[in-house]
Amino acid sequence: MANAPVQRMSKLMAKTLRDDPADAEVLSHKLLVRAGYVRRTAAGLWSWLPLGKKVLGNIERIVREEMDAIGAQEVQLPALLPREPYEATGRWQEYGPELFRLQDRKGGDYLLGPTHEEIFTLLVKDQASSYKDLPVILYQIQNKYRDEARPRAGILRGREFLMKDSYSFDVADEGLAESYALHRAAYQRIFERLGLDYRIVAATAGAMGGSKSEEFLAPAEAGEDTFADCPNCDYAANTEAITFRLTPVDATDVPAAEDIPTPDTPTIETLAASLGVEASATLKNLLVKVDGEIVAVGVPGDREVDMDKVEAHFAPAAVELVTAEDFVGRPDLVRGYVGPQGLGEKVTYIADPRVAPGTAWITGANKADTHAKNVVAGRDFEVDTYVDVVVVREGDPCPNCGTGLKLDRAIEIGHIFQLGRKYADALKLDVLGQNGKPARVTMGSYGIGVSRAVAALAEQHADDKGLVWSKEVAPADVHVVAAGKALQTELALEVSDKLAAAGVRVLVDDRAGVSPGVKFTDAELIGVPQILVAGRRSGEGVVELKDRRTGEREEVTVEEALTRLTS
């Protein structure tokens, strides 16, 4: 086995900190900064120090091994990209303010790549001419850029982040399904090797487009995603992808709709209190503008509208809430008293499936200080489109079996898409088919957040003392600590050299003038799997071995320590 380098902490460009950073909100942010893995450069921009770079490198290695195992080929494309391909697919506009746009000295428009679907499509268009050239899977590991409005949580949500993005190209849909399955299995192997607890959940495609999408989520309190798990069946989904069943009910016995005076009740809370009813008996109607046109969104009064779902439904159109000015010159829209009946053709009405045909509601009467009761969906008003647009709650019924769902927070660490022909259509990617005619290529897109995986590991694998890395991703295999005296330092360096000669990666704390207590604290903070201490019994050739994860410690001879750590 080749010699591994010994990293001396006396030479290491990584200072540990006793206190949490003032702006740190989540555990991974605190520990990665305190342990000397990363440093903040600016809002959403991070510098990776030597220890952090080693962890990143280990994750990259695992990703490469598993991608290569499914026949994927690694390439490197530019991060600075021309506008034209993104204009052709519509994403120059769709990405909105999250896209970093810039111009060269001649006024040409460019962007910093958030993902590379367009550029990979053009690459394959240039290289592949026949069905014989396909299928092919290409990937890269590269920094991506998104102009986050509020970068937060350390490396979890930054403006620059390291990502593995891969793309599959097939002639037939069956081939796309196979490429998708290959990636799905590879991702499972990757995250299992990393030691991450994860869930595979149904997801929405968003601006990426496509017919099928799944996310790989790492459960963690610091996560920005919320997913639902069914305790009774195998259903799991990002809350944005959950769809409530549309179940019509019989409204034969519901009396005719009737206006009722309700002065000073412009909110659901005041209305329910005034009438002595539950908020769930009322119908809330939220007005939004979609590319400037007013749309009404109907949900039960006890539920909140999930604007992410509304935006996803209308994507790529821009969605915004109405303002007071939008009511001017619109006598049919009475602020605080809007109802779906009588809105007219000028206003599109979408409703949550809970507002099913036959359900009866108390809702606005489109008159000041007036509501209407016994307003029945499908009888007194029509719904243009049913879309699940409510914020999912704990206990909502599972779409598969009806059992109450359980909600958890998680970090998105991977996302896979069956894109279909969206990008091939926009950029005219065809190859010569087996029948001698042009065949439009179908495509998949697959991402892993490499730098985000570091944060997810730090969230899941830590204790009150610091980080606890697995051997696969740790910056070293063994952290050797010289307690301080010359004899102890000499033994520590000797053991380190022998371990390195056997191929063991060693981080040795040989710092002079640093107390043993500080060294021990730093060793636990940094989180290398095995800690070897050359301490008070160094003169006897005895050292202490400590397992960072379990906390178990044992005094053994140097020879025994070397045997254990090199076996």
From Swiss-Prot:
UniProt GO BP: prolyl-tRNA aminoacylation
Annotated catalysed reactions: tRNA(Pro) + L-proline + ATP = L-prolyl-tRNA(Pro) + AMP + diphosphate
First and last residue of the signal peptide: none
Gene3D superfamilies: Anticodon-binding domain, Bira Bifunctional Protein, Domain 2
Localization, UniProt: Cytoplasm
Keywords, sorted A to Z: Aminoacyl-tRNA synthetase, ATP-binding, Cytoplasm, Ligase, Nucleotide-binding, Protein biosynthesis
Keyword Flavoprotein: no
One of the record's GO cellular component terms: cytosol
Pfam families for this protein: HGTP_anticodon, tRNA-synt_2b, tRNA_edit
Main location: cytoplasm
EC number: 6.1.1.15
GO MF: aminoacyl-tRNA deacylase activity; ATP binding; proline-tRNA ligase activity
Enzyme superclass (EC): ligase
NCBIfam families on file: PRK09194.1, proS_fam_II
HAMAP family named in the record: Pro_tRNA_synth_type1
Chain's role: Catalyzes the attachment of proline to tRNA(Pro) in a two-step reaction: proline is first activated by ATP to form Pro-AMP and then transferred to the acceptor end of tRNA(Pro). As ProRS can inadvertently accommodate and process non-cognate amino acids such as alanine and cysteine, to avoid such errors it has two additional distinct editing activities against alanine. One activity is designated as 'pretransfer' editing and involves the tRNA(Pro)-independent hydrolysis of activated Ala-AMP.
PANTHER family hit by this protein: MITOCHONDRIAL RIBOSOME PROTEIN L39/PROLYL-TRNA LIGASE FAMILY MEMBER (PTHR42753), PROLINE--TRNA LIGASE (PTHR42753:SF2)
Subunit architecture: Homodimer.
Family: Belongs to the class-II aminoacyl-tRNA synthetase family. ProS type 1 subfamily.
Record note on domains: Consists of three domains: the N-terminal catalytic domain, the editing domain and the C-terminal anticodon-binding domain.
Protein name according to UniProt: Proline--tRNA ligase
Natural source organism: Streptomyces coelicolor (strain ATCC BAA-471 / A3(2) / M145)
